UniProtKB/Swiss-Prot annotation:
Transit peptide, residues from-to: 1-33
Spans traversing the lipid bilayer: 34-57, 71-91, 99-119
Region entry Required for hepatitis C virus non-structural protein NS5A degradation, spans: 103-112
Listed name of the protein: Interferon alpha-inducible protein 27, mitochondrial
Gene: IFI27
Mediates interaction with SKP2 and hepatitis C virus non-structural protein NS5A: annotated segments: 76-122
Membrane topology term: Multi-pass membrane protein
BP GO annotations: apoptotic process; defense response to virus; extrinsic apoptotic signaling pathway; innate immune response; intrinsic apoptotic signaling pathway; modulation by host of viral genome replication; negative regulation of transcription by RNA polymerase II; proteasome-mediated ubiquitin-dependent protein catabolic process
Organism: Homo sapiens (Human)
Assembly information from the UniProt record: Homodimer. Interacts with hepatitis C virus/HCV non-structural protein NS5A; promotes the ubiquitin-mediated proteasomal degradation of NS5A. Interacts with SKP2; promotes the ubiquitin-mediated proteasomal degradation of NS5A. Interacts with NR4A1. May interact with BCL2.
PTM comment, free text: Ubiquitinated by TRIM21 via 'Lys-6'-linked ubiquitin chains leading to IFI27 mitochondrial migration.
Record carries keyword Transcription regulation: yes
Amino acid sequence: MEASALTSSAVTSVAKVVRVASGSAVVLPLARIATVVIGGVVAMAAVPMVLSAMGFTAAGIASSSIAAKMMSAAAIANGGGVASGSLVATLQSLGATGLSGLTKFILGSIGSAIAAVIARFY
């Protein structure tokens, strides 16, 4: 299951539970807060999993993976080497070293914002 589908599913589930169980006006804002937190956590957790699934691992680029195909295409396009700062080089660096604290903060913020927008309509 993709991260966006997982986030959407979690948001919908939280919203439905709140609608069924809520008799008070306080529960709905708490559910929205929970939805926003879930969105941020899912966004932070999904990126490393997606990078690994694509083949950008701590040990390097996995053979016969999407990452290997991307690297091959980038090398052919650049005459034999992958350009520093290119998408492939950046993703390889993220896969090898992991995400920085700032990157996690930004991803969490974006995931929370998306979840807040989704929760607003449910």
